[in-house]
């Protein structure tokens, strides 16, 4: 296994158990629902993972595109949501077929750390093309340079304490310490960005950047950014 894409195309130990997984996806779905601008909105969740509660997001918008690079994940999305006319599960290369300037909101949660800078810049160009004037790109769970695995572990344990899965979270952290995740993280690494770096990257891609007051999900040591597409009517 030589890439993060290969790693995610399988059942992984990243979740300590079913309760952890459910609470994670529920929290993210609730956060995304809060970002949907209107019932008529078109939304793209890029790098969505299994998106267990995507139907709740779809109920708040007109169309929800779910895109993930892992074939196994897409199979599960199709099995779970194939009968929902508001939801379409796409491979990353199919996102290019979405009409330009047709999307109101793009959410990219916990993906940047697995991309090279060149990959990120290429995707930003794609996302910018798909967004309408006045649309927003929300890039979440960005890891700052000063956040360590220990900080992430503390955030998980706090989430587990409040979510009622502390015992399984402790066991999960022990498993992760000896898992492929740790080996790949050491060999390939995770991309980390400062706030200033993210602002520069978003501006270079044609967005007006903003730091969100809180991160999507449970880990508030990480960052969420909003890239605004200027609306000529507001100029």
Describe the residue ranges of each PLM region.
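Class I (Rossmann-like) S-adenosyl-L-methionine-dependent methyltransferase catalytic domain
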Residues: 1-36, 40, 50-85, 91-97, ...
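Conserved beta-strand/loop positions that form the S-adenosyl-L-methionine
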Residues: 46
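A conserved beta-strand element that flanks and buttresses the S-adenosyl-L-methionine
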Residues: 107
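A short glycine-rich, Lys/Arg-flanked "PGG" loop and its adjoining helix->strand segment in the class I
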Residues: 121-133
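Helix-capping/helix-break motifs at membrane-protein junctions
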Residues: 116-117
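Short catalytic micro-motifs in class I SAM-dependent methyltransferases
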Residues: 110-111
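Structural signature of beta-strand start/N-cap positions in the alpha/beta core
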Residues: 42, 63, 102-104
């Amino acid at each position: 296994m030589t890439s993060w894409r290969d790693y995610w195309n399988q059942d992984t130990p990243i979740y300590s158990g079913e309760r952890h997984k459910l609470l994670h996806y529920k929290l993210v779905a609730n956060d995304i629902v809060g970002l949907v601008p209107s019932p008529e909105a078109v939304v793209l969740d890029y790098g969505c993972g299994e998106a267990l509660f995507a139907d709740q997001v779809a109920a708040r918008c007109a169309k929800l595109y779910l895109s993930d690079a892992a074939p196994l994940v897409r199979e599960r999305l199709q099995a779970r949501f194939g009968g929902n006319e508001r939801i379409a599960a796409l491979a990353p290369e199919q996102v290019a077929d979405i009409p330009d300037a047709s999307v109101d909101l793009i959410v990219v949660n916990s993906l940047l750390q697995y991309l090279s800078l060149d990959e990120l810049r290429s995707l930003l160009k794609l996302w910018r093309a798909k967004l309408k004037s006045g649309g927003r790109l929300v890039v979440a769970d960005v890891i700052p340079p000063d956040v360590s695995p220990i900080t992430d572990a503390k955030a998980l344990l706090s989430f587990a304490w409040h979510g009622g899965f502390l015992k399984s979270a402790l066991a999960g952290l022990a498993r992760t310490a000896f898992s492929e995740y740790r080996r790949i993280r050491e060999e390939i690494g995770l991309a980390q960005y400062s706030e200033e770096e993210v602002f520069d990257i978003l501006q270079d891609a044609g967005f007006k950047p903003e730091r969100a007051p809180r991160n999507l999900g449970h880990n508030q040591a990480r960052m969420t950014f909003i890239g605004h597409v200027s609306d000529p009517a507001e100029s």
